[in-house]
Amino acid sequence: MRAAKQSSTGAENHLLKALPENEVERLLSESTPVLLKRRQILYSSGNIIKFCYFPLNGMISVLSTTESGKSLILGIVGNEGFVGAAALLHPPIAPYEIMAQVETRALRVKAEVLRTEFKRGGKFQQLVMRYLHQVLSQISQSAVCHRFHTVAQCLACWLLISADRVQTEEFSLTQQCLSQMLGVPRTNITMIAAKFQDAGLINYRYGKIKIVDRQRLEKAACECYQVAKQEK
C-alpha cells in the first residue's frame, strides 16, 4: 500500500492526481500496487472485468483480436488514464484485449469499487466521462489510420504515441510487438524501421527504440498523431 500512498502525492497517474483528496483517498485505500509483466494480458475480449488498472508508468495496449489470433492496435493507455472502463457498464464485459506492452507499474482497484465511486457523481465521474471521450476518439481515429494510411505513416505515428505514453524518447518494443500492433508481417516492420534508422529518425537495436529526430518523425507520421496530441 506504500506505493499507492506515494502516487497520491507523487502524481504518477494524472487522472488520480486531478481528483479531490477525499475521492482519491477512497480509491487509494482500496488499491493494490502491482507490477505488470511485458505482454501480460489483463483481459481478453469477452472477459468479465473484475479489476481496473491505473498505470503509474509504462503503457498498456488496447487490441482488437480475431479468432485466428491476429491483432490490431486500437489505442495505448499510459499514466494519463486507466483501463477497465467497461466495468462501469452493464454487463461489465471487456470489448477488447488489454495487454501491458512493456513492464508497467500500476494500481489495481476492484471494479465494484470504481462503480461505487462513479455512482457518487463527483469529480471522478466527470473525469472518467471526459477520459472515455478521449479513448473513443483514439479508437475511431485508429480505424481511419489503419484503413487509409501507409504502414510507414502508421508506424511513425504509433512510435510517437508510445514515446508520449512512457514519457521518454527511448523505450522497448520488439519488431514482433510492432508487427502485432499494426497487423502487418514482421518483415514489413523490419524494412520500414531500417529506413527510419538510415534516415536518422530513430535508432533501433535489440528491441530498443530511441527517437533521434522527433520533428522529422512527426513529419513522417500521418495526421493521426496530431489528433492524438490534441485529445490527450
What are the residue ranges of the model-derived segments?
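Residues that scaffold the ATP/ADP-binding catalytic core of kinase and kinase-like folds
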Residues: 27, 63, 85-86, 116-117, ...
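Polybasic "coupling" helices that flank or enter modular domains
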Residues: 101-103, 118-185
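Cyclic nucleotide-binding regulatory domains
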Residues: 40-102
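Cyclic nucleotide-binding regulatory module and flanking cytosolic helices
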Residues: 1-37, 82, 87-89
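Phosphate-/nucleic-acid-contacting segments
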Residues: 161-232
